[in-house]
C-alpha cells in the first residue's frame, strides 16, 4: 500500500492520467531539452514527461520515501533520469548551465508555490519554458492585469520575467487527498527583455515598499525612501503621484525601481 500524502509537505497526488498528460504537454518537450520535475511523488507526471523524450530528466524530491522509490524502481527505460533528494526552495537555480535548454514542471504544493515560481522564473539561466499546477486563486493573481483586485507583487514580478499563459483548471476530485479548492495549470515563457541582476534587486525592493502599503498613494509610500521630492520623481516617470501601486504596469515598476535606486544614490 503506497504511503499517505504528507500534509506537512503539502502533498496532493494527481491520479488522473489524462490531466497528467495535458500538463506535461504544456511544456512542449523536445529531444534536446533538459527537464526538471519538482516533487514527482508517485510519478503521475513523470511518465508523460519521459514519454515525450527529453535529453535529460532530473527529479527533485524532498520526500525521502519517493526519492528512494524513484532510485530503486525507476520507470522502465529511464536511465537518463536522475533523482535529487532536495528541497526545491533551496535548490541553486542560478547554477543551471545556460548552455542547455531547461524546462521546469511540477504539481507544486500550495504552500510553497509562490516563492518557488518567484525564484525559478527570475534566477534560472537557460530556462526556456515552465509549466506548473498551482492553486487557482494564485494563478488568477499571476495573470491579473493592472488595476484589478488580484494584481500584486507576484503578478508584477512574474510578468516582468515571463509571459504567463493560463492553460486550464483542474478540479479537486482528481487528487488524493482531495483539496478544498480548484487548481490551475499555467505555462511560462521567459521574456527577452527581462530585468538583469541589478534591476531585479531594485524591482524586488520597490515591490516590497509598494505592496506592503498597497492602499496608500505612491507619493506617500515613497516619500521616506527617496532623497528628493517623491511627487517630482513620479511625475518625471509619467506616473500620477496620487496613484496606488496596483495601477502600475510591470514596465512602470521596473522604471520606478531604477528611479528609486538612483534617488538614494544622489
Swiss-Prot record:
It is found in: Cytoplasm. It is an enzyme of class 2 (transferase). InterPro entries: KsgA/Erm (IPR001737), rRNA_Ade_diMease-like_C (IPR023165), rRNA_Ade_Mease_Trfase_CS (IPR020596), rRNA_Ade_methylase_Trfase_N (IPR020598), rRNA_adenine_dimethylase (IPR011530), SAM-dependent_MTases_sf (IPR029063). S-adenosyl-L-methionine binds at residues 12, 14, 39, 61, 87, 107. It holds the Pfam family RrnaAD. Transmembrane segments: none annotated. GO terms for cellular component: cytosol. It catalyses: adenosine(1518)/adenosine(1519) in 16S rRNA + 4 S-adenosyl-L-methionine = N(6)-dimethyladenosine(1518)/N(6)-dimethyladenosine(1519) in 16S rRNA + 4 S-adenosyl-L-homocysteine + 4 H(+). The keyword Transferase applies. Its EC number is 2.1.1.182. GO terms for molecular function: 16S rRNA (adenine(1518)-N(6)/adenine(1519)-N(6))-dimethyltransferase activity; RNA binding. It comes from the Bacteria. Keywords: Cytoplasm, Methyltransferase, RNA-binding, rRNA processing, S-adenosyl-L-methionine, Transferase. Specifically dimethylates two adjacent adenosines (A1518 and A1519) in the loop of a conserved hairpin near the 3'-end of 16S rRNA in the 30S particle. May play a critical role in biogenesis of 30S subunits. Belongs to the class I-like SAM-binding methyltransferase superfamily. rRNA adenine N(6)-methyltransferase family. RsmA subfamily. This is Ribosomal RNA small subunit methyltransferase A. It comes from Nitratidesulfovibrio vulgaris (strain DP4). The gene is rsmA.
Amino acid at each position: 500500500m503506497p504511503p499517505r500524502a504528507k500534509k506537512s509537505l503539502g502533498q496532493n497526488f494527481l491520479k488522473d492520467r489524462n490531466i497528467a498528460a495535458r500538463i506535461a504537454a504544456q511544456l512542449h518537450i523536445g529531444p534536446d531539452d533538459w527537464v526538471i520535475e519538482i516533487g514527482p511523488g508517485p510519478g503521475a507526471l513523470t511518465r508523460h514527461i519521459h514519454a515525450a523524450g527529453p535529453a535529460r530528466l532530473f527529479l527533485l524530491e524532498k520526500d525521502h520515501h519517493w526519492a528512494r522509490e524513484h532510485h530503486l524502481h525507476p520507470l522502465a527505460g529511464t536511465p537518463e533520469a536522475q533523482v535529487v533528494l532536495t528541497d526545491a526552495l533551496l535548490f541553486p537555480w542560478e547554477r543551471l548551465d545556460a548552455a542547455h535548454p531547461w524546462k521546469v514542471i511540477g504539481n507544486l504544493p500550495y504552500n510553497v508555490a509562490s516563492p518557488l515560481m518567484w525564484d525559478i522564473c527570475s534566477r534560472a539561466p537557460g530556462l526556456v519554458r515552465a509549466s506548473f499546477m498551482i492553486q487557482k486563486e494564485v494563478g488568477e493573481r499571476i495573470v491579473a492585469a493592472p488595476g484589478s483586485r488580484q494584481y500584486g507583487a507576484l503578478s508584477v514580478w512574474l510578468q516582468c520575467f515571463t509571459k504567463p499563459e493560463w492553460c486550464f483548471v483542474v478540479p479537486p476530485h482528481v487528487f488524493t487527498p482531495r483539496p478544498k479548492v480548484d487548481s490551475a495549470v499555467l505555462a511560462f515563457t521567459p521574456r527577452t527583455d527581462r530585468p538583469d541582476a541589478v534591476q531585479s534587486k531594485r524591482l524586488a525592493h520597490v515591490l516590497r515598499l509598494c505592496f506592503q502599503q498597497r492602499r496608500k498613494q505612491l507619493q506617500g509610500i515613497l516619500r521616506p525612501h527617496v532623497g528628493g521630492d517623491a511627487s517630482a520623481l513620479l511625475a518625471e516617470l509619467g506616473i500620477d503621484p496620487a496613484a496606488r501601486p496596483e495601477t502600475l504596469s510591470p514596465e512602470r515598476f521596473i522604471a520606478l525601481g531604477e528611479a528609486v535606486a538612483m534617488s538614494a544614490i544622489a
